[in-house]
Regions:
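Cys-dependent protein tyrosine phosphatase-like superfamily
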Residues: 2-188, 201-251
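Ser/Thr-glycine-rich phosphate-binding loops at phosphate-binding pockets of nucleotides
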Residues: 193, 197-198
Length: 251
């Protein structure tokens, strides 16, 4: 069997698998705020189907002995792959505000899937906007040309994290004001992976609320596995459509 036939069979099999998965009933969404107190920590990572790294920031103890309220502050990754079940389940969170940190390039590449009509306010606070546009263009060009010489995605993200602190104070100040303006109603913020920009925003907010630094770091680091899982899914799709060599250079 030649390579074109193998690729055709692989794509057909993947399409059939996706179609079958669409009809498998999703498990009921476990919302921590609606569970007994002793079960909430175990379900901090909400079991959405197509929204990665969706977490409730409730339950963290502050330095003065209080706790962050469950069901008020949520963080997540992209909604581009949200399932129909996910869109239905979002309503159960009674969100007042959704804050999107993604760049215009990211939103063009993978638009959010949200309930229609959305029963919450969407606020765009793009961080790394022009930088991300350039990065997306570079990655796309490298994938198409199969050229990954001297391309280090980890170095790019380290540089981005430094920029959060040095260059994006107005954006994160706007984020804090948006949370305040929600007047105690549930707020969700997200970027693409729900890790760096979203994590930086969560860290700022938790420190303002008085959560000790050790717990803030613990929450930030909790994004590593969900982000890795999401990246692995992207690599699988690259293997299907671009081949092993291209996928290995990204992974």
């Amino acid at each position: 069997m030649n390579s074109k036939k193998v690729l055709g069979v692989t794509i057909t099999a993947a399409a059939l698998l996706i179609a079958v998965i669409q009809f498998i009933p999703a498990p009921a969404l476990q919302i921590p705020a609606q569970l007994p107190a002793e079960q909430r920590d175990a379900h901090r990572l909400l079991n959405f189907e197509g929204i990665s790294n969706f977490r409730d920031l409730g339950g963290y103890q502050t330095a003065d002995g209080r706790r962050v309220k469950w069901g008020q502050l949520y963080r997540a990754g992209s909604f581009a792959e949200a399932s129909r079940s996910d869109l239905d389940n979002l309503a159960a969170l009674n969100l007042a505000t959704l804050i999107d940190f993604r760049s215009s390039a990211e939103k063009e590449e993978e638009p959010n899937r949200l309930p229609e009509p959305a029963n919450f306010t969407v606020i765009d606070i793009p961080v790394l906007d022009e930088g991300n546009r350039n990065l997306f263009a570079e990655i796309s060009e490298r994938i198409e040309s199969d050229d990954f010489a001297e391309f280090d995605p980890n170095q790019i993200m380290e540089q981005a994290n430094r920029q959060f602190a040095d260059e994006f104070t107005p954006q994160f100040r706007q984020f804090i004001h948006a949370v305040e303006d929600a007047n105690g109603q549930p707020v969700l913020w997200h970027c693409t992976a729900g890790k760096d920009r979203t994590g930086f925003a969560a860290a700022i907010l938790l420190r303002i609320l008085g959560v000790p630094q050790a717990l803030v770091i613990q929450d930030y680091m909790a994004s590593r596995q969900p982000a890795l899982d999401a990246r692995n899914r992207q690599v699988v799709m690259l293997r299907l459509f671009k081949g092993e060599e291209t996928a290995d250079k990204i992974s």
